[in-house]
């Protein structure tokens, strides 16, 4: 999955947070919903500007970020 095709960061959109290209839906909103157990189909209903590919791109983006640094869990 090439998430760069679907995700953009623009300082003038959503305070510079990562968003799905062509929308104002932040990647964090998608990830928060998935983490809360919301099914992708429900996310697509709630945010009709999204696609399945956009949801997969958000997950791929998060996976790349997770590989970039270690977050100490003992702190």
Where in the sequence are the language-model features?
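A short, structured beta-strand/loop element
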Residues: 1-41
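Long, charge-rich, low-complexity alpha-helical segments
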Residues: 25-75
């Amino acid at each position: 999955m090439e998430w760069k095709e679907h995700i953009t960061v623009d300082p003038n959109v959503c305070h510079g947070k990562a968003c799905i290209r062509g929308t104002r839906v932040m990647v964090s909103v998608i990830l928060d919903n998935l983490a809360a157990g919301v099914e992708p189909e429900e996310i697509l209903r709630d945010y009709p500007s999204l696609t399945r590919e956009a949801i997969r791109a958000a997950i791929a983006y998060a996976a790349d970020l997770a590989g970039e640094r270690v977050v100490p869990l003992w702190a």
